[in-house]
Design a protein with these regions (language model features):
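Conserved beta-strand hairpin/beta-sheet module of binuclear metal-dependent hydrolase folds
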Residues: 1-52, 142-163, 182
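Metallo-beta-lactamase
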Residues: 6, 89-157
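Short beta->alpha connector loops
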Residues: 7-9, 68-71, 93, 165-168
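A short helix->loop->beta-strand "cap" motif at the edges of active sites that frequently abuts
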Residues: 18, 83-86, 103, 211-215
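Pre-active-site segment of Zn-dependent metallo-hydrolases
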Residues: 18-64, 75-80, 129-134, 167-177
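Active-site neighborhood of phospho(di)ester-bond hydrolases with catalytic His/Asp-centered motifs
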Residues: 22-23, 59-68, 88-91, 159-165, ...
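Active-site HxH/HxHxD metal-binding segment of metal-dependent hydrolases
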Residues: 31, 49-113, 126-130
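Cap/insert and terminal regions of metallo-dependent hydrolase folds
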Residues: 166-215
């Protein structure tokens, strides 16, 4: 297994003979509007990509989009990723978003799927700690839904990408059911006046205690 965190939630993972690109946000630094948060008017992305987009895409077999918010699937990704690339998404809303950009092989992960020698399992996510955030997310981004993804293959550790979530029953269930050995958690506790969007420090500790053997 080779895992390269590129920026934010964007990760390139070579695993079980397949190379995955997870949540590609490929825009140049500062070219996207600020996201709704207590950080105010910081433009996104906050940092440059560490390597060229061409190098990021080199060798990629499949793209996984945990949800279609712009920091996980942006116009730059839609333009750069080949249109025949398989794209794994969470639901019909996100499938429609990706298909609208011309992609021809968009697959909804509803439970379990097989990619080569790798088994993908959907894990539920909850992108808010207060139901009051749902209308805001839907108004600004089109959706409040998100998912996590668990990857398994022979001879490699089980890997769990939490996606954008807070601690809730679904996350705890994924830890219990899949017993991941590697956990890639989207953290930072990002908040709006209506509530929190991501795992905070205390919840990361909670994950660590729930899965003490995991990295």
């Amino acid at each position: 297994m080779e895992l390269l965190q590129l920026r934010n939630a964007t990760v390139k993972l070579s695993y079980g003979g397949t190379t995955f690109l997870i949540d590609p946000m490929l825009s140049k630094k500062g070219t996207l509007d600020p996201f709704p948060s207590l950080r105010g008017d910081e433009r996104n992305p906050l940092n440059d990509l560490p390597i060229p987009v061409e190098e990021i895409l080199n060798g990629v077999d499949v793209v996984i989009v945990t949800h279609s918010h712009i920091d996980h699937w942006d116009d730059a990704a839609a333009q750069a990723v080949p249109k025949d690339m398989p794209i794994i998404v969470q639901d019909q809303f996100d499938a429609d978003v990706v298909t609208a950009s011309g992609f021809k092989d968009v697959r909804i992960l509803d439970g379990e799927a097989r990619i080569g020698q790798v088994t993908l399992n959907r894990a539920e996510g909850q992108h808010y700690d207060s139901p009051g955030l749902v209308p805001l997310l839907e108004e600004v981004t089109g959706t409040a839904a998100t998912m996590g993804v668990v990857l398994r293959t022979d001879g490699e550790p089980t890997v769990y990408f939490t996606g954008d979530t807070v601690w809730f029953e679904g996350l705890e269930t994924a830890l219990r059911n899949f017993a991941p050995q590697v956990i890639v958690a989207n953290t930072g506790g990002n908040s709006t006046p209506l509530g929190r969007l991501l795992l905070d420090d205390a919840e990361v500790v909670r994950i660590s205690r729930a899965a003490p053997e995991a990295t």
